């Protein structure tokens, strides 16, 4: 899942996708870009969100570290602090990794809040409507 609400938002998303393709793996599908209101905080800046499906041979934690590196390169300064969200140039979240379930301090798969966030589920359901959530056992389109 990708999101941005600062700067040239479309450019930020396209740059993130290009860097993901260069370092993580082949982007096999990319959703449309969705304009959405901020979630979890107030801002005058609307978000642009998208979902991408990437084929990779890398393990989940390597994907996480590479996407965090890409965020920093594009201009992300920090993730939420103490659960407080803020404006960001780019946010890249690893939502799913096949049907893998992972619960570590650094990474939880599937993303524990994805099904509660329409700005995540709408683009994800566009590119993978019949993909089944490995814990909830429902298709992405059913979770919308």
Where do the protein language model's features map onto the residues?
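Hydrophobic alpha-helical segments and helix-packing faces
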Residues: 6-9, 13, 23, 41, ...
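Beta-strand scaffold of nucleotide-dependent catalytic cores
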Residues: 28-30, 105
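Short beta-strand-to-loop capping motifs
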Residues: 4, 52-58, 96-98
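Short, charge-patterned binding micro-sites
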Residues: 31-57
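Flexible, gly/pro- and Lys/Arg-enriched active-site loops
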Residues: 39-46, 61-144
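N-terminal beta1-alpha1 ligand-phosphate binding loop
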Residues: 1-24, 31-37
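A structural signal for short, well-ordered beta-strand segments
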Residues: 2, 30, 50-52, 92-94
């Amino acid at each position: 899942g990708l999101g941005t609400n600062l700067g040239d938002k479309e450019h930020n998303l396209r740059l993130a996708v290009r860097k993901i393709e260069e370092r993580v793996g082949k982007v096999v599908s990319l959703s449309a870009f969705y304009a959405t209101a901020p979630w979890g905080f107030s801002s005058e800046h609307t978000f642009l969100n998208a979902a991408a499906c990437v084929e990779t041979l890398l393990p989940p934690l390597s994907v996480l570290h590479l996407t965090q590196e890409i965020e920093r390169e594009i201009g992300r300064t920090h993730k939420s602090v103490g659960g407080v969200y803020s404006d960001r140039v780019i946010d890249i979240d690893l939502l799913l990794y096949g049907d893998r379930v992972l619960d570590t301090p650094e990474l939880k798969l599937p993303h524990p809040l994805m099904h509660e966030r329409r700005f995540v589920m709408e683009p994800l359901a566009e590119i993978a409507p019949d993909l089944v959530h490995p814990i909830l056992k429902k298709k992405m389109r059913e979770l919308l």
